[in-house]
């Protein structure tokens, strides 16, 4: 059977921009989103498969009760550095702890190619920032695949780097969905009540039938056309992906920034906050307007 339902679950700011990477949004917000994903994925009519970034391991405890093959991870860094499995809230999965795939597209193709006996119905969930969701949305538009889009929208802007997505990757119409209520004494209860919880469907691309036929004919001709022996193209990562701080020549940001005279303890260098690995902050977003 293969994949019958595809869901993309992510975060949006007031400008409908996604955080570029996981470290560009608050760990508390990712933890809440992953918890909601686990609740929504508990559908009785299919097997849920949740794809997430590897650097959300310490926040993805609600997903770890799923069987290992149904909770694959993607190492979304564009560099080939060894995974950081020990330091910070955005530490990655240890080797062999979870099933690894190249990206969400590879997971979708694998599930479609899988032919177990008896056939299984898969509900695919792609949960993460732009470095995971944007390449998959581009692929879905290319193959004319409809996607259910589920998001938590904040009224502020991201602390880190945002990634604006084309409007064709967003649903035209959305309705509200109800999150699983937080405990009455939850420290983020008041803050989470200010957010919008949006659900919509991203429709497939509007390519005409003639264009699809021409593309099919070109691919058929290319199969039988002789090609000179040339080395294969070098694989490059998607532009949305970003290397680690060491590859960019920047030092790791410590947990506590030293204070200097005239600066408060909560003030951090805005250059470090945007370009480097975001330090741990007590808030989720920078308010755009001053109260």
UniProtKB/Swiss-Prot annotation:
Pfam families: US2 (PF02476)
Family: Belongs to the herpesviridae HHV-1 US2 protein family.
InterPro entries: Herpes_US2_varicellovirus (IPR003485), Ig-like_dom_sf (IPR036179)
Main localization, broad class: host cell
Organism of this sequence: Human herpesvirus 1 (strain 17) (HHV-1)
Annotated stretches, region: Disordered: 251-270
Residues found modified as N-acetylglycine: 2
Subcellular location: Host cytoplasm; Host nucleus
Keyword Lipid biosynthesis included in the entry's annotation: no
Top-rank lineage group of the source organism: Viruses
Name by which UniProt lists this protein: Protein US2
Oligomer status and interactors: Interacts with host KRT18.
One Gene Ontology cellular component annotation held by this UniProt entry: host cell nucleus
Assigned keywords, A-Z: Acetylation, Host cytoplasm, Host nucleus, Host-virus interaction
């Amino acid at each position: 059977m293969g994949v019958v339902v595809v869901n993309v679950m992510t975060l949006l700011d007031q400008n409908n921009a996604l955080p570029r990477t996981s470290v560009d949004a608050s760990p508390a917000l990712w933890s809440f989103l992953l918890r909601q994903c686990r609740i929504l994925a508990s559908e009785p009519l299919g097997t849920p498969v949740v794809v997430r970034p590897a650097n959300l391991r310490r926040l993805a405890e609600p997903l770890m009760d799923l069987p290992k093959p149904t909770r694959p991870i993607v190492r979304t860094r564009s560099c080939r550095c060894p995974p950081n499995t020990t330091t910070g809230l955005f530490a990655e999965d240890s080797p062999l702890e979870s099933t690894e795939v190249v990206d969400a597209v590879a997971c979708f193709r694998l599930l479609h190619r899988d032919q177990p006996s008896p056939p299984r119905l898969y509900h695919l969930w792609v949960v993460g920032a732009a470095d995971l969701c944007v390449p998959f949305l581009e692929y879905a538009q290319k193959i004319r695949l409809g996607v259910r889009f589920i998001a938590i929208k904040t009224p502020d802007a991201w602390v880190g780097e945002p990634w604006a997505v084309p409007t064709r990757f967003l649903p035209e119409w959305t309705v509200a969905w109800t999150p699983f209520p937080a405990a009455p004494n939850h420290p983020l209860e008041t803050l989470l009540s200010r957010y919008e919880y949006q659900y919509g469907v991203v429709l497939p691309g509007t390519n005409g039938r003639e264009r699809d036929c021409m593309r099919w004919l070109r691919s058929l001709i290319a199969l039988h056309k002789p090609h000179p022996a040339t080395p294969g193209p070098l694989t490059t990562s998607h532009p949305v992906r970003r290397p680690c701080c060491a590859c960019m020549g920047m030092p790791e940001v410590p947990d506590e920034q030293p204070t200097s005279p005239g600066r408060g303890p909560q003030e951090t260098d805005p250059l470090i906050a945007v370009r480097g690995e975001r330090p741990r902050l007590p808030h989720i977003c920078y308010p755009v307007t001053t109260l």
